[in-house]
Amino acid sequence: MGIGYFNKDKTPDFFVSFAQGTWPDLSWTKQAMIDGATGKIEFSDSLGYYQTSSPIAVDFNEDGVDEVLLNVDYQVLDSIGLKSFYNTLLVISFETKEVVTLVEGIPGHNVASTPWAGDLDNDGFLDIVYSVGTNQFKTYTFDGLRVNYIGTKIPMTPKHQWGAYMGSEYDGVFKKK
């Protein structure tokens, strides 16, 4: 779950991403954004193949409204039906109702690694770090890991409140603005 200000009111909102099925037959993931003020589901989708990484909240376009950054797996079938898995980062804007691919698919699968957003190099701009398992032919494997870095020119003021697993302070506490 990720917490942020996904609309223009002053009440924090919630974004959840969860697998559907019964273990070990978990195949697809569903997502929903719940308006914190009304309790209504304002966004619902099924993006990608099974993974349990948490979403984070970042104001990418600096308009005072957070977007969700979500690590998503998807599968591709070749001409003889062999599955390959790829991983990408998606940005979801609830203001524009857009889902935008931040990076092209990387071969591999991410079961449970949440992206991180903050100022890694202390230059005042947003950095994103995320990881992907390197085995593109099997899920639920941990036989290789690729750590990826994205540097941006998005200013880090104010600090993002939910830029990591369980929030930017890693304590599961969301501090209202």
Regions found by a protein language model. Give the residues of each.
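Short loop/turn segments that connect beta-strands within beta-propeller blades
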Residues: D35-T38, F94-K97, K153
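Beta-propeller blade termini
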Residues: M1-N7, S53-F60, N71, S113-L120
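A detector of repeated loop/turn-to-beta-strand junctions in beta-rich toroidal repeat architectures
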Residues: S27-K30, S84-Y86, D143-G144, K159
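Short glycine/acidic-enriched loop and turn motifs that connect beta-strands
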Residues: A19-D25, D73-S79, G133-T139
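A short beta-strand motif characteristic of beta-propeller blades
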Residues: K40-S46, E98-G105
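Short coil/turn segments at the loop-to-beta-strand junctions that recur within blades
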Residues: L47-S53, I106-A112, M166-Y170
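Blade-level signature of beta-propeller repeat domains, shared across WD40, Kelch, NHL, RCC1
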Residues: T114-K177
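Acidic/hydrophobic-patterned starts of short beta strands in beta-sheet-rich repeat architectures
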Residues: K8-F18, E62-D73, N122-S131
